[in-house]
Design a protein with these regions (language model features):
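A short helix->loop->beta-strand "cap" motif at the edges of active sites that frequently abuts
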Residues: 147-150
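Conserved SGNH/GDSL esterase-like catalytic core that processes O-acyl groups on lipids
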Residues: 52-54, 62-137
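Catalytic His-Asp segment of secreted/periplasmic serine-dependent ester chemistry enzymes
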Residues: 160-244
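Alpha-helical scaffolding segments of alpha/beta enzyme cores, especially the outer helices
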Residues: 136, 140-144, 179-186
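Residue-level recognition of beta-strand->loop/alpha-helix junctions
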Residues: 89-91, 155, 197-200
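N-terminal secretory targeting modules
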Residues: 1-54, 234, 238-244
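Alpha/beta-hydrolase-fold catalytic nucleophile elbow
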Residues: 119, 154-155
Length: 244
């Protein structure tokens, strides 16, 4: 019975994910309205060399779910760096990895960039991007980044915890998210790259306390949820620095 259920997932999954994804759009849509402009010099009053930081990705980077720009993931992470950060955020809500290649990389700033952070894959998981296609396009992103920049690759969050998705979408989306996440983890196994296990480090907390950690759309993280993401990123980067 278990084997039959596993075999049935790809067959049923396409129809269920498509139908349930449309049903999930019934709730409040926090992506409407003018997106946040997150570009800024963060911590300008701090001592030290300015770090040039670029973020690529989807709505989680664009600040959807955050109550204001300063509580968005890139701003909060930059504020905790302990030195000035020249922050550029190219992310767009709804983006898949192909959008990063086609629309965000062409806008990548010229000049020296110290750190690039990427959070992409959740939309690819829900919209059934093939793992091989995702890997190919993600490699294109990595190959286009400036030599010498530190690359921080955020994994796919625990989509199976999203309250807005009814079952069986939660389960199926979680499986798909894990597949895409494994690709990111593998690609991060190279010098100068750091993988952040967002699902593993934050997923259990989101499942325990969805009312606090999800925003009002029951889909994106809230301010408190993004704080957990920031902690996961900071800890992974610190651990990577200790190993190098």
């Amino acid at each position: 019975m278990i084997g039959a259920a596993i075999v049935a997932i790809p067959v049923v999954g396409v129809a269920v994910l498509g139908a349930e994804a449309m049903l999930a759009a019934r709730g409040p849509d926090l992506t409407q309205g003018e997106p946040y402009d997150l570009d800024d010099i963060v911590g300008a009053d701090k001592d030290g060399r300015t770090e040039h930081m670029v973020w690529l990705g989807d709505s989680t980077v664009a600040g959807v779910g955050a109550s204001e720009p300063d509580t968005a993931l890139p701003r909060v992470y930059a504020a905790g760096r302990g030195h000035p950060v020249d922050l550029t955020v190219l992310a767009v809500s709804g983006a898949r990895v192909s959008d990063v290649v086609d629309d965000q990389l062409p806008r990548f700033p010229e000049g020296d960039v110290d750190t690039v952070l990427i959070s992409i894959g959740a939309n690819d998981a829900v919209h059934l991007t093939r793992a091989g296609d995702f890997e190919r396009r993600y490699r294109q992103v990595l190959d286009a980044l400036p030599a010498g920049a530190d690359v921080v690759m955020l994994g796919v969050p625990d989509i199976g915890s999203v309250p807005r998705f009814a079952q069986p979408l939660r389960y199926l989306a979680g499986v798909r998210g894990g597949t895409i996440d494994a690709v990111i983890d593998d690609l991060a196994d190279a010098p100068g790259r750091t993988y952040v296990d967002i699902a593993g480090e934050t997923g259990p907390a989101f499942r325990r306390d969805p009312g606090t950690l999800f925003a009002s759309d029951d889909y994106h993280p809230s301010d408190a949820g993004y704080e957990l993401w920031v902690s996961a990123v900071a800890e992974a980067v610190e651990a990577s620095d200790d190993r190098s």
